[in-house]
Regions:
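N-terminal targeting peptides
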Residues: 1-82, 93-96, 102-113, 117, ...
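Acidic, glycine-centered low-complexity repeats within long intrinsically disordered regions
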Residues: 35, 50-52, 122, 155, ...
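Ankyrin-repeat and related helical/solenoid repeat scaffolds used for protein-protein interactions
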Residues: 421, 433, 456, 468, ...
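Pentatricopeptide repeat
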Residues: 20-25, 29, 40, 56-61, ...
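Inter-helix linker motif
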Residues: 16, 51-52, 87, 122, ...
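Methionine-biased hydrophobic packing positions in alpha-helices, especially
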Residues: 47-48, 83-86, 118-121, 153, ...
Length: 606
């Protein structure tokens, strides 16, 4: 630090004063280059006054530069106030440096205020100051203000340059505003401002965030055509854009083209490609590129492992998913809740509920990873698929509260489905009824699973009641909901209700499927309405639906009950199965003329 020499008097000779001032300036400038802002401020505020030196503009601006380099916007603003208090008017450099300090921290309000103060100090905002303010707005998520500042620069007689445009395009990229970003990129060329790699990269990333993979790739190709030298960031953004839109083939092509462009793929390149393959369940390719990381001298990180585990999960490769999860500690990679959630989900898809529970309740806690909604929901769903309704309820009602995890709609839906599959309609009804009290809004899936549970237990009144509640809750019933209620009424002998609900589906613009028709045909069979059964079964091919073994069996029974033996013989003679399974579809041969003739006398079920 700069100190006064021993034996000095109360006043310094003019040349000594100049020497000390030069030394102080040099020291502050050195601190500024190293971003040592505290040392610079201490020298400015303490040591210079102790040497009876009044800090001048150069010393203040150097100290402001130290704050800017360290991203310390608050001390920078305080220094400006100090200058005003000393009647030392800040100049354009002072303001520009302070605004730049704000830009790095996204303090756009303070940056705008400082720019607004400049005219009151008879200072005109310059290119550096305005570009820094644009950058501050971008960092603060204020892309509209950034664009306004850029467009307002000519009014202040300031011509935007490459830095100004890049700051604005970067602001648009952070806001996923791909259209204005493309527009500014074109405008740069029109204004004879040559876009650089930063301009193109920000535009590619903006398109990627806006899921515009074609435009991302187009901009990348434009870079190559104009010799703008794309780098790994350019390719990584384009690969990510393709991956987000499930264009995994193009992601792979871009990765493999990087060496030809003399660009070495980095870990981000590989991770983005693995993620692209993961989204489409291309687990073999994901494994290939994961294995390519060490061959390229790169170490897989948490993102790499999470992507490959998720790829295995989507590809039904639960053993591989668990293998990669177990490898993470040896690779010195910390598994996260994402890693475990993907592995648990892999076990869930394979109905390996014991493994799912072991991961959730044992291994996660042993590795110090806190379970979350995703991991708990996957475990509940694993229990549902494994027929373990008691364990599903235990996770929802006991373990999640202990873990301080609030169940959401997916948690309840999985538990209700578990109860439905376990013929536990009472629990399904209770869970659905409890959801609003816990601040969870039942969805169409919640209602459908509960209605299905009631249908399986023969509680047609409850099924019908929940269908009504569903409408009251403004949850749109689906074909699944209606199928369950129609089937419930049909099985309980409520054939009029079953047929009435079936007809309502058309009014609600719901498309009946094979299940809907089979339930309606079953209602006709129970009520001996053979004409209606025939009309329904002949209607199915018109909707691109083929009757299956159940449809034919129910219609045949309806004919038998009504003593329609000639019709039955003709009907069966005109049908043949497609395939060998009893659930296979059936179709009619041209010889079924009697069945078609009888259809003319059949009526719409009522």
């Amino acid at each position: 630090m700069v100190t006064a020499g021993r034996g000095e008097g109360t006043s310094l000779e003019p040349h000594r004063c100049r020497d000390e001032r030069h030394r102080c300036r040099a020291a502050i400038d050195k601190f500024a280059r190293g971003a040592h802002w505290q040392e610079a401020i201490s020298l400015l505020r303490c040591e210079m006054p102790s040497l009876r030196l009044s800090p001048d503009m150069i010393a203040y601006n150097s100290t402001l530069n130290a704050c800017k380099r360290a991203g310390q916007w608050q001390p920078a603003i305080a220094l400006l106030s100090d200058m005003l208090g000393m009647t030392l008017a800040p100049d354009a450099i002072s303001y520009s440096t302070a605004v730049s300090s704000c830009s790095r921290s996204g303090q756009w309000q303070h940056a705008l205020r400082l720019v607004g103060e400049m005219p009151t100090m008879t200072l005109a905002p310059n290119l550096i100051c305005l570009s820094a303010c644009i950058s501050a707005c971008g960092q603060g998520g204020q892309w509209q203000l950034a664009v306004d500042l850029l467009h307002g620069m000519p009014c202040l007689r300031v011509t935007p340059n490459q830095i100004s445009y890049n700051a604005t395009i970067s602001a648009l990229e952070k806001g996923s505003q791909w259209q204005p970003a493309l527009s500014l990129l074109s405008q740069m060329r029109e204004m004879s401002t040559i876009p650089d790699t930063i301009s193109y990269n920000a535009t590619i990333s903006a398109c990627a965030k806006g899921r515009q993979w074609q435009r991302s790739v187009d901009v990348l190709h434009t870079m190559t055509f104009l010799r703008a030298e794309p780098n790994e960031i350019s390719y990584n953004s384009a690969i990510t854009a393709c991956g987000r839109s499930a264009e995994w083939q193009l992601s792979v092509t871009l990765l493999e083209s990087m060496p030809r462009a003399r660009i070495a793929p980095d870990r981000i390149s590989y991770n983005a490609t693995i993620s692209a393959c993961e989204k489409r369940g291309r687990w073999q390719l994901a494994l290939h590129f994961f294995g390519a990381l060490p061959n390229s001298g790169l170490t897989p990180n948490e993102i790499s492992y999470n992507a490959v585990i998720s790829a295995c999960e989507k590809g039904g490769q639960w053993q591989l998913a668990l293998k990669f999860l177990s490898e993470m500690p040896r690779a010195r990679v910390m598994a996260s809740e994402i890693s475990f959630s993907a592995a648990i989900s892999a076990c869930e898809k394979a109905a390996r509920w014991q493994l799912a529970l072991s991961l959730l309740l044992e291994e996660m806690l042993e590795r110090g990873v806190a379970p979350n909604n995703f991991s708990c929901n996957a475990a509940i769903s694993a229990c549902e698929k494994g027929g373990q309704w008691q364990m599903a309820l235990c996770l929802l009602l006991t373990q999640m509260p202990v873990l301080r995890i609030t169940p959401n709609e997916i948690s309840f839906n999985a538990a209700i489905s578990a109860c439905e599959k376990g013929d536990q309609w009472e629990y399904a009804v209770c869970l659905l009824s409890e959801m609003p009290a816990l601040g969870v809004t039942p969805s169409e899936v919640s209602f459908s699973a509960t209605i299905s549970a009631c249908e399986m237990s023969g509680n047609w009144q409850l099924a019908l009641d929940f269908l009504g509640r569903m409408r009251a809750a403004r949850s749109t019933p689906s074909e699944i909901s209606y199928n369950a209620v129609v089937s419930s009424c049909e099985k309980s002998g409520q054939w009029q209700l079953a047929l009435g609900l079936f007809n309502t589906m058309h009014d609600l613009k719901l498309t009946p499927d094979e299940v809907s028709y089979n339930a309606a045909i079953g209602a006709c069979e129970r009520s001996s309405h053979w004409q209606a059964a025939l009309a329904l079964i002949l209607k199915m091919p018109q909707l691109s639906l083929q009757p299956n073994e159940i449809s034919v069996s129910l219609a045949s029974t309806a004919f038998q009950r009504c003593g329609q033996w000639p019709l039955l013989q003709s009907f069966l003679g005109g049908t043949r199965p497609i395939g060998d399974s009893p659930r296979d579809q059936w179709t009619w041969t041209p010889g079924s003329s009697l069945a078609l003739h009888c259809a003319t006398s059949a009526h719409r079920p009522t």
